[in-house]
Amino acid sequence: IYASGVAGIQVLRKNRELLQGKRCAVLAVGASPADPATIETVRKLNLKEDLAAIPFFYARGAWDLQKMSFADRTLCKMLQKSVAKKDPASLEPWEQALLEAAGGTADWTDREYLQPLLRWIRQGE
């Protein structure tokens, strides 16, 4: 997930006719905590119209500022400075994650995030 956009959604849209009748799901990975309201917002923004019925799963990932492009690093640093000025009690989950990772790396990966997707896969076997 990058700025509420899920990488690869365009591939689904472009190939939706080829995928008709096949089981497919979306696993989105991002830095934000698994907040149900945020996840639902991302799902609705990305899986619209004929993609709305595709199952959507979320897993929290990792953050490494050094692996980002110069433009992304610069944008994230500016955003972190802006968010740091806010009242901590008013921060959204993604803003808290942004500050938590400030200036370096963070790894929030956990195999448990994959369990809902794995259950969905096993149901179709």
Predicted feature descriptions by range:
Residues 3-125:
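FMN-binding flavodoxin-like domain, especially the glycine-rich phosphate-binding loop
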